Each structure stands twice: as structure tokens, then as C-alpha cells.
Amino acid sequence: VCRSNVFDLHGEWDLAYLDPPYGSANVKMPSSRVRYAAYYHLWKSVVLNDQPTLFGAAGRREDSRDGISASVFEDFHMGTSGRLKAIEAIERLVQQVKARYILLSYNSSGGRVTREEIQQMLSENGTLMDVMAVDYAHHNMANMFRTRKWCCADRGHQEYLFLLRKE
């Protein structure tokens, strides 16, 4: 386990497990509404063992605000390649991580990057050895009053695991 900016890691590993944030695939909801930093603020406080300034009814860390803690992995804008910035970031990470194998976890209904886009990108960066899909129940945002309907409610909810051998 490493506690630093993932793009600044300098180690070498046999296996790297990557579970990047994926924001929201719900086009009815601004992507900034679903940020990992907002959901994982408690864990960050435990790891840092600090006394952060809090805000809001939930008592979140000040540094988990949408405008402060945006993640490139959650960016739904188009990048210079004509692809989503999120897939560009995942590809950059895959290319930079010094590991013989990468196990990448991604969600079928959480992000705007598709399974096919990830498979294509991984195939261009090594040998895609296996893809697993694990079924999960939808989370409580499926019942949000504001949107009335989760964008992917008609599909199953799966967590994908991609095993890549880098060459």
C-alpha cells in the first residue's frame, strides 16, 4: 500500500492493483457530485491522523470539496486525444506503473469510460490475460429523488477486473 500521488510512485512490483475513481455515468447529475474524496474523507482522516477543518451536515473534510479534490480519473471532459480525460489518465497510469502484472478494477455503471474502451486501451499496453465481471446490487443513488432514475438501472451492476501482463 502506497500513500502518495499515484503518478509519483517510483517502485517496482510483480503485481499492481489499481482501483481508480470513476465518478458518475449519470448524465442527469454533474460529475462533481460523485467524488471519491467526498466518500472516503473519513478514511483519509484515519490515515493522516489529523484534525481537519470540517464543513456541511455530514462533517466532511474541507479538502474534500468538489472544487478542491477533483480527480483526473473522474473527469468527463474530452482530452487532446479525442477520448475522455479519464481513460487518458488510466492509460497514463498503466504505462507508468512498473509492474509485471496489473489488476485493474472498474465499475460497469459508475463511470463514463466503457468496458470496451478499457479493454482496447489495455490491449494496446500489454497482453490482456483475463476479464472478470462480478455482479453487485445497485447502490442507494439509484433511488435519488433529484434524478428519479439512475442512468443504468436497466442494466446489471458489475465490477470488472482486468488482468494485464505488461510487455
Please annotate each region the language model reported:
Residues 1-167:
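Class I S-adenosyl-L-methionine-dependent methyltransferase catalytic core
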